[in-house]
Structures are given as C-alpha cells and as structure tokens.
Regions:
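Redox- and metal-dependent alpha/beta enzyme cores, enriched for Fe-S-associated oxidoreductases
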Residues: 169-227
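Internal active-site segments that recognize and position negatively charged phosphoryl groups
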Residues: 146-179
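An acidic, phosphate/nucleotide-engaging active-site surface
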Residues: 209-258
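A general structural motif
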Residues: 154-156, 183, 242
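Electropositive, gly/pro-rich neighborhoods at or near active sites that engage anionic ligands
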Residues: 2-154
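Gly/Ser/Thr-rich loops at beta-strand to alpha-helix junctions
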Residues: 162-171, 193-195, 250-254
C-alpha cells in the first residue's frame, strides 16, 4: 500500500496553520500553537495516516489551546446561496451541452475551489471565472470513458461530498447522472458536524440535495475526510457495498487512497 503522508503534506499543513497563527497576538501562545502543530506532524504515521488526520488534530489543538472554534456559517450561506441563485442557469447550460455528463462533471470540479482549509483567499469572483472557464478544462478521456462504462453497469453510487457551495454543484451532477442512468441509486455522504467549510447535513438541506439522493452523515466528528476505519459499521457497509464511489475533494481522496474500493 502506498504511503499516505508526504513532504508536500507537511508544507501545506504548516502554511495553512501559520496563516491562522498570524491572528494570534500573544507571542508566547502563538509559539506554543506552532510548536503543537510541529509535534502533531512529527507524530504522524506516514504509512497509515493521511493529512486530514493531522487537520483533525490541529482543530483539537486550536480548540484546547486557544479556545477557538472555526465558524464558517456565514461563508457557507454565502456560497450555497450563490450557487442556488445560479442553479437554473447552470442547469440549462448542462442540459443544452453536447455531453451533459461531461459538462456537469466540469462544473462540480470547479466547485472544489471553495476550500477555506487550503486557500487563504477564496472569493466569489474567482469562482464565477472558474465556472465560465470549465468548458476549456480538459477531462481525462480514458478516465471519463471508464467512468461511463462503470456507470452503465452500476446500480448503486456513493457520493462523498466536500465543501459548501460545491455541494450544490454536486446536486446538479447527481441530477444529471440520474437522468442518464435512471436505475442508479445515489447515496450522498456529508460530514457529521461542521469542520472548516465542509458540507454538513445543514448544507445538504439548504441546497435541496435530498431531492436527488439519500443523504446521510458519515458519523466521524472533526475529520475533513472519510476514513474507513473510523466509520460506523452501518455507514462503512453501505460504502463497501456500493458499486461505485465518487470522492470529492482532496481530504476524502487521501483518506480512501489504496482502500480497495472502487473510488
């Protein structure tokens, strides 16, 4: 099995954590926070633990040392509302496309930009630009052909969601999938509770995800990913029994890399 934690993961975690540390005015506290992050990274098992595990531990450190809880409620409403406002227009664009599935995939991929855990400067203007540019973004033809072949045979799809806003674009993709593959049953999996700006049940309800899929929580608190070993027996069984999994976002993919499922 390939390793799950790389040197690039260390650099990314340190940069995002230092960006948050800049808001700490007490230098002694800031030092303890950064030292705690270094300790978390040092204690990671690169063979079995992916970067979202470190993220989870850093969230606990911030809570215990600084008494801080990340609150992205307003940001979530902003981006969910933005995509919902555009939804009829995007829906029409996908339906009119020469290849509706490809168009829906490209839009859903553009939504992955809305990641406040990785980027320090996420803004609606850049998101709009990305959605306008998606038709020019190439899709791997071999992977796309494989996906279509597997969808033609699949009866069940587990869709692991990532961020707010993006989840509304995921809804459009699922809607497109179900129109093209009417027998496909879709299970949407969201975070157990708020962490960073990841999609939760509240976000799913806000964008009407339940209109196109069965929506469940993953049951894992404070983890920006989907770690099979941390899932409840019932949720894990549903993922293992799905014919196909779509894992949106880096955190979900990192946790599931090499897991043996059809991701």
């Amino acid at each position: 099995m390939p390793r799950k934690f790389y040197a690039d993961c260390v650099a990314c975690l340190m940069q995002s954590s230092l960006n948050k540390a800049n808001a700490i005015t007490d230098e002694a506290l800031r030092y303890e926070y950064v030292r705690g992050i270094c300790r978390i990274i040092q204690e990671m098992d690169p063979e079995t633990e992916a970067a979202p595990i470190a993220d989870s531990r850093i969230v606990h450190l911030r809570r215990e040392l600084l008494g801080l809880e990340d609150d992205y409620t307003e940001i979530k409403h902003l981006y969910n509302g933005l995509i919902l406002q555009l939804y009829p227009q995007l829906q029409a664009k996908v339906r009119a496309a020469a290849d509706p599935l490809r168009a829906a995939i490209q839009l859903a991929a553009a939504g992955n930009y809305i990641d406040f855990g990785v980027l320090s400067d996420v803004n609606p203007e850049r998101l709009m630009e990305l959605m306008d540019e998606v038709a020019e973004k190439p899709v791997s033809e071999s992977e796309y052909a494989q996906l279509r072949a597997e969808l033609a045979e699949a009866r069940t799809l587990a869709y692991l969601h990532d961020n707010c806003g993006e989840v509304a674009l995921d809804k459009l993709l699922i809607e497109t999938l179900r129109s093209l593959y009417p027998r496909l049953q879709v299970l949407s999996v969201v975070r157990e509770r708020p962490i960073l700006n990841d999609a939760t049940m509240e976000d799913a309800e806000e964008v009407g995800l339940n209109e196109v899929a069965e929506v469940i929580r993953n049951g894992i608190p404070d983890l920006p990913g989907t770690q099979l070993s941390s899932l409840s027996e019932s949720v894990r069984a549903r993922l293992e029994n799905a014919d196909l999994l779509i894992a949106k976002g880096q955190g979900n993919f990192e946790c599931l890399a090499g897991c043996g499922l059809n991701v």
